[in-house]
Amino acid sequence: MDDWEGPIDTGGIPEDGSSFDVIVVGGGPSGSAAASYNALNGCKVLLIEKEIWPRDKICGDAVGGKSLSHVKELGVKEMVEKTPHFMVDSIVFGSANGNTVQVMLPQDEFEKKMAGYSLPRMQFDYMMFKRATEIVTEAGGSVIQGFNVKEVLDNDGAIVGVS
């Protein structure tokens, strides 16, 4: 079994009435990063994902160079490099009439492995969510899978929970 094919243990569901500084709805790459950064900055985070991992999602399957500094900072870049992937060295634009233009990415970024990667979304999302689960739970927060948020609860304009 590959590293992205097994279930991710997110622990138990927090008790009713639990309090959190931040609630992040959605455990894709952006939600996982938001939950991780908030937890690393001392917030007690609740990360909620409607699916149960592993899951797949249609995507272009690329991680751009500008996001790699965050991927590295969160401890996921090494995980990516240990799985099947391609390093991106250029971008090809194509038109309906078959013409193409290839734009090479900066050589120094490619040499530093910071130009970008191409890998299945399932792999990348899995690694981001798994790492977010580790960071959030180590900081005292909670992660829930298989929960679909139907309503954001507010009290005089302040978010007080979800259901």
Q: Which residues make up each language-model segment?
A:
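Glycine-rich FAD pyrophosphate-binding loop
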Residues: 23, 39-59
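N-terminal Rossmann-fold NAD(P) dinucleotide-binding loop
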Residues: 31-32
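N-terminal FAD cofactor-binding segment of flavoenzymes
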Residues: 57-97
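Short glycine-rich hinge loops at helix-strand junctions in the catalytic core
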Residues: 42, 75, 136
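Conserved N-terminal helical subregion
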Residues: 17-19, 92-163
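Glycine-rich Rossmann-fold phosphate-binding loop(s) that bind the pyrophosphate
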Residues: 26-28
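Short, well-ordered alpha-helices that flank and scaffold nucleotide-derived cofactor binding pockets
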Residues: 36, 40, 69, 130, ...
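Extreme N-terminal leader/targeting segments of oxidoreductases
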Residues: 1-22, 37-41
